[in-house]
Amino acid sequence: MEMAKKKAVALVAAFLALVMAFAAAGCGTKGTGKDGAAAKKNELLFATGGTAGTYYPLGGAIAKVWNSNIPGINVTVQSSGASVENLRLLDKGDADLALAMTNVADDAFKGKGQFSAPLKNFKAVGVVYPDVVQAIVAADSNIKTIQDLKGKKVAVGPTGSGTEVTTRIILAAYGLNYTERKDLQPVYATYADAVDQFKDGHLDSVWNVLAVPAAAIQDITTTKGIRFLSLEGPEYEKLLAENPLLVPYEIPAGTYKGQDKPVKTVAINSALYVRADLPEDLVYQLTKVLYEKKDEIAQGHDRGRQIDLQKALAGITTPVHPGAAKYYAEKGIKLP
């Protein structure tokens, strides 16, 4: 009887050992072994923006070029609320790579604006392209100046986006506050939703901070006449003086259908940021491909043509990742 019990125990132990061995082998093929761990580390999530904006399709073009030029990585693009949300995703480790406006990144690092505390788990790689503030109204609207937006229904950008942050700063410079005084009716719509609402006459104005020309605005002009609001007067000079990361920009006449005059506005650089703990060699490769394969990126999205190594650190105020810094050192570019 005792012998039978011992045999049963031995058989159970052997069976459990066999199950554990198979489990370990199975897990090893999915990432617990040396090769599996490396594969897991190279699965990268790239936070971008709304599907109707610039970040998402541009991010897709960049990811495609990374995947085809850097062995062993797989970058997956994810739509998001853009800059503010993207930096929070990096900080929490829920994304590995992200696009964000440099002014929003500056706020995040310092714990200002929409960030109640500093975010530290992200580092800069470099500037990708300039985003341009583009404020539109209907062609037959009686809104002629920024101040005329008082009491109007205005799409200010998605919650958690660089568009909303920048729009709020600009409107405040012209004496309009929609977060406390409710000087106007803000609509926190995605670009796609804002386009539809504007076409249907439910919005008085739409503010975009996008590359020029913006597909969202081009979409509107196919069915509706528009007019741009220029940034003018002493408020404009004060805006630039108090916000050094904003730079003067002029949208050339003829950029959009029915736009017969240049538009005076501002631009803000959009840059690539990564998790602070990404390996140096990986970020070096990502940086190298970003700036040396811009023509390939441009085949997927026209903004690729604006990627410029000589402007890679323009407006970058947050720490640069060591992997990117290594690449810049090789190219003779000094860190800010």
Residue map of PLM features:
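Short, low-complexity disordered leader/linker segments with a strong preference
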Residues: 1-43, 336
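Immediate post-signal peptide segment of exported/extracytoplasmic ligand-binding proteins
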Residues: 28-47, 118, 142-153, 322, ...
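Bilobed "Venus flytrap"/periplasmic-binding protein-like clamshell domains
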Residues: 43-69, 73-77, 131-200, 314, ...
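Sec-exported extracytoplasmic/periplasmic mature domains
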Residues: 63-71, 91-95, 110, 172-176, ...
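Divalent cation-coordinating acidic motifs and surrounding scaffolds
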Residues: 79-82, 86-97
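Pocket-lining segment of extracytoplasmic ligand-binding domains
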Residues: 102-104, 111-114, 120, 141, ...
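Short, solvent-exposed loop/turn segments at the edges of secondary structure
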Residues: 128-132, 266-267
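Segments of small-molecule ligand-sensing domains
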Residues: 257, 261-336
